[in-house]
Structure formats: structure tokens, C-alpha cells
């Protein structure tokens, strides 16, 4: 999480970053670069139970819950997908379950991802979001039982 920023503020930063990129080749290069900056997930987390179902590529997603905030770590075996999940981690990690559940994630449309991604990759992106929100729902349920 970008310290003390709302989900919407981080989304706006990403939209601003993409606004400087003129072509889709440049945008894809930037997405690849974002993926390269995402720390590699430790091998012990790269197991079947941490894979995101519905992605053509292999995506591993793990979550932790500390001090009322959900933190995500992720990785992928392809550079574009790793870049996509890195943006989601950047936007959603470090927020409360309610903030994650309620997040509209408008940046995905605003930077053109829904119209420029192949259908399979777009489906994978939706699956990643669904998994991240499912973790948040689970942690919210835990809050109520504690």
C-alpha cells in the first residue's frame, strides 16, 4: 500500500501514469516494467492452493491480515499478467476488508484495460479481483467472530 493513501488516490496515480503513455505498445511495456518491479513471491507460496483459478497464466496470490489491514503478495509466470497483478496489489494491499470489498477499481476501465486486453486475459483480471475481494470478505467475517 502506498502509505496513508486511499484506494481512489492510488487509482488516480495509476491513471495519471498511464496518461503519459501514447500508444498501446508503450502501455504494455509499462505494464511489463511494473511486473518486473513486483518482488518475486517466495517459492513456498507457489503452490496450487494459492493459484488464481480462471487465469490463463499461472497467478499466485497470498493474503495476510494484520492490525485490521489486508496485505497481498502475488506473482505470475508471465510478464504482462505479473504487471496486471502488481497494479492490483498496489491499489488494494494495506486497506481494510471493507475498503477492498467496496473498491470499484475504476482505473481498470480508465486506463483502457477492459478494451485492450484479450478476452482470456480480461477474464483472468476479473478472477484476480474476485480472489482479492474474497480474501477481504473472509477477513471481515473473522473480525466479527473475534
Descriptions of predicted regions:
Residues 84-95:
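Alpha-helical support elements that line or immediately flank enzyme active sites
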